[in-house]
Regions:
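Non-heme Fe(II)-dependent double-stranded beta-helix
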Residues: 1-13, 20-122
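A structural signal for short, well-ordered beta-strand segments
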Residues: 96-98, 133-135, 205-209
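Catalytic core of non-heme Fe(II) oxygenases with the double-stranded beta-helix
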Residues: 107-175, 216-221
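Conserved metal-binding segment of the jelly-roll/cupin
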Residues: 177-191
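Non-heme Fe(II)/2-oxoglutarate
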Residues: 190-191, 195-294
Length: 294
């Protein structure tokens, strides 16, 4: 109980807290293998794999479809109690993804606040809150997660985006290095970034918790940043009603039709290219079969 109370106190004060070790070496190895399998090829046509929406990261969406351990991680008692204690009982898991950060030396991802709720809707009322759970799948001694302590402590909207915020002195920033399996919670309303330089590729998971009643930003939903949560239903066997609710199983279904704007201008030529590739593959296999029969 003292661990919960102390961690919650730090989280409320600083906006970020490093959690005690929760993942066994065997569990970590399984998670690493499943995650790396998604980095072998890009998601394309019938392939499952990674997506790339910026130059420095290979994104792996829907990690709850990879292995049961990815579902069990956010359900660990300390994590569940901290999330509910910081937010409220209505909160549930809304995103579960990860990415490989490629090596870089520039400040490609400066200090920023996440844009996820609709700023117009909450212009005259208290802003909604969320929490993110980070998990390093590799040892991290460069390109670490950085957070400006206390920058989450405001009730009105802070400026989102990367060009609003100047550099902050190191003594105000929590930088999280650590071994594979390192876990931390943070409020994305606070200023945060991936530090630079990042000297080697590294993999990490991020889970996002917030209430289903929050009105989301269109920039969040229509630029490929927010993916509806998918889960392998076989991983849910044996879970309690409370655990299922925390994974978002009991929330109302969304009626919105996704309208992803990313690469929208290229959708027609990309569709033509994929169909042409499939057609070429069909004729190649047909000709090869005839040649082999001779």
């Amino acid at each position: 109980m003292s661990q919960l109370i102390n961690s919650l106190k730090v989280l409320k004060r600083d906006g970020v807290v490093i959690l005690p070790e929760c993942i066994t070496p065997d569990e970590l190895s399984i998670m690493q293998q499943h995650f790396c399998s998604q980095l072998m090829r890009p998601a394309f046509n019938a392939w499952q794999g990674y997506a790339q929406t910026d130059r420095r990261r290979l994104m792996v969406d829907q990690v709850l479809t990879l292995d049961r351990l990815f579902c069990q991680l956010p359900l660990m008692p300390l994590i569940h109690q901290l999330v509910v204690g910081y937010l409220d009982e209505t909160v549930c898991l809304q995103e579960a993804k990860g990415w490989q950060s490629l090596p870089f030396s520039d400040n490609f991802h400066p200090l920023h606040r996440d844009e996820w709720y609709c700023p117009q809707y909450y212009q005259t009322q208290a802003i909604p809150r969320s929490l993110k759970l980070g998990c390093y799948l590799d040892d991290v001694d460069s390109g670490e997660f950085a957070y400006v302590k206390g920058s989450h402590q405001h009730s009105s909207q802070g400026e989102v985006g990367e060009h609003y915020h100047q550099h902050t002195d190191d003594n105000e920033i929590t930088k999280i290095t650590g071994k594979a399996g390192t876990l931390f919670l943070f409020d994305p309303e606070g200023l945060h970034q991936q530090s630079f330089p990042n000297l080697s590729a590294r993999n990490a998971l991020f889970y996002h918790f917030f209430s289903p009643s929050v009105v989301l930003s269109t920039n969040f939903t229509q630029w490929g940043r927010f993916q509806r949560l998918l889960v392998d239903t076989s991983f849910l066997s044996g879970l309690s009603e409370q655990q299922l609710a925390f994974l978002g199983i009991s929330r109302l279904p969304s009626r919105d039709i996704p309208s992803v704007q990313h690469y929208r201008a290229l959708s027609t030529p990309m569709n033509l290219a994929v169909r042409s590739l499939n057609e070429a593959h069909y004729w190649f296999e047909k000709i090869k079969a005839k040649v082999l029969r001779k």
